[in-house]
C-alpha cells in the first residue's frame, strides 16, 4: 500500500449544502462487460454488446482481444439506445503482448484464452499488477496442459505459450484469495478439448455473486455448466466442451458503481434514483438495497429503476461482506459518519485488491480524525467528528469514491488522484457534481 507520487493533483470533494435529489444514470457493469467480451471472442459466431462500459478496464480487455486477432467494431445505435460493440470471433494468434493495466479481470481471464492462441502471448501491466496473485490460474492451466513462463513468481509478468488448443479436464485450485480464479477457468472451459472441472480446495470462497454471474452468462451463450447450486458437489464447477453462441446482450448498469450515489442519499437525508436497476441480477451491488436500508435508508424498486431515500439518520452495522467485498470502501465511509459503531467482516481478501484496502481505509479515515481498527478479516469503525485533509487513493477507484462520500459531510476533504475512478466509472467527478447540482 503505497501512495503514487506521480499523482499529486488534489480534487476538492464537494460538500453537500443540503439533501440531494437527483437521478443518476450509472454506466454499464464492468464485470458483465468484460465477461461478455471474453465469451463473445470465444463464440462460433458474431455477437453484440449494447451499452457496454467504456472505462480503462474494459478498453484494456477489448484491446487485448484485438491483439489476439478478435475484431471489435464500435458504434452508436439509434437515439436513446447508446453505444454498441460488435464482436467478430477469429482464430486466436500470437505472438502478442497484452497490457493488463491493473485489471483483475484482464490479468486472470485472458491467460486461459491465450492457451487457445497459436503462439506466445506475453502479459504485463502496472507495477501494482505484479503484486496481485495469479498462482491459482497459472498452476491450474499447467495442470490442464498449458506451458507458462513466470519465473516461479505466480504473478505478472508472464508468457503463455499457446498451442492452438488445451486439453482441459479436472483441476484443483485454492481460490480463497480471488473468485476470479474460478471464473477465469470456467469462461474458457467450453473451448478446452475436455471442458473443465474446477474443484476449490481452500477456505471460504469470496465474492460468490461473481461466480454466479459467470455461470449465468455461460449458460446464456449455450454452455452446459454444473454447479453446487444446481445439485452438484460442493465447491465443484463443471463446464462441458462445446460451441458458444453469439448473443445480443444489453449490459446492466454497474450496481457497485451506484454505491457512492446511494450513499449520498443516506449521508444527506436525500433521494437518489438509479434508472434501469434490474429486478434480477447476480451483481454484488444489489446487496446495497439491504445494507443501506439497515443503515437508515429506504428503497423502492419501480419499473423505472431504484428509488433510494435517506432518513437523515445513519446507523452503524455489523455485517459479513465476504460475498460483496468490493462494497467495503463505500460502506466504511458511510459507517464513519454513523451514530453508532460498525463491524465489517469477511473481507481479509481485500488486502490483495487494487491496494490493501483494509490498511488504506484505516489510515485515510483515521487521518481525517476517525477511529478505525483493522481486524483479522475486516474493520471496526467507531464514528468520530471528522475534519478535512488529503484522502489518498493508492490508485484505487473505490478509495476515491469513498473519499467523495466522506466529503459530502466533512468540509475540506481533498482527494488525491480522483482520475483513478476512470478504471470503472468514467466521468465520476462530473456525475458527482451533477448529482449535487453544482
From Swiss-Prot:
Pathway: Metabolic intermediate biosynthesis; chorismate biosynthesis; chorismate from D-erythrose 4-phosphate and phosphoenolpyruvate: step 6/7. HAMAP family: EPSP_synth. It comes from Streptomyces coelicolor (strain ATCC BAA-471 / A3(2) / M145). It catalyses: 3-phosphoshikimate + phosphoenolpyruvate = 5-O-(1-carboxyvinyl)-3-phosphoshikimate + phosphate. Keywords: Amino-acid biosynthesis, Aromatic amino acid biosynthesis, Cytoplasm, Transferase. SUPFAM superfamilies: EPT/RTPC-like. Transmembrane segments: none annotated. This is 3-phosphoshikimate 1-carboxyvinyltransferase 1. One of its GO terms (biological process) is amino acid biosynthetic process. It comes from the Bacteria. Its main location: cytoplasm. Belongs to the EPSP synthase family. The keyword Amino-acid biosynthesis applies. InterPro entries: Enolpyruvate_Tfrase_dom, Enolpyruvate_Tfrase_sf, EPSP_synthase, EPSP_synthase_CS, RNA3'P_cycl/enolpyr_Trfase_a/b.
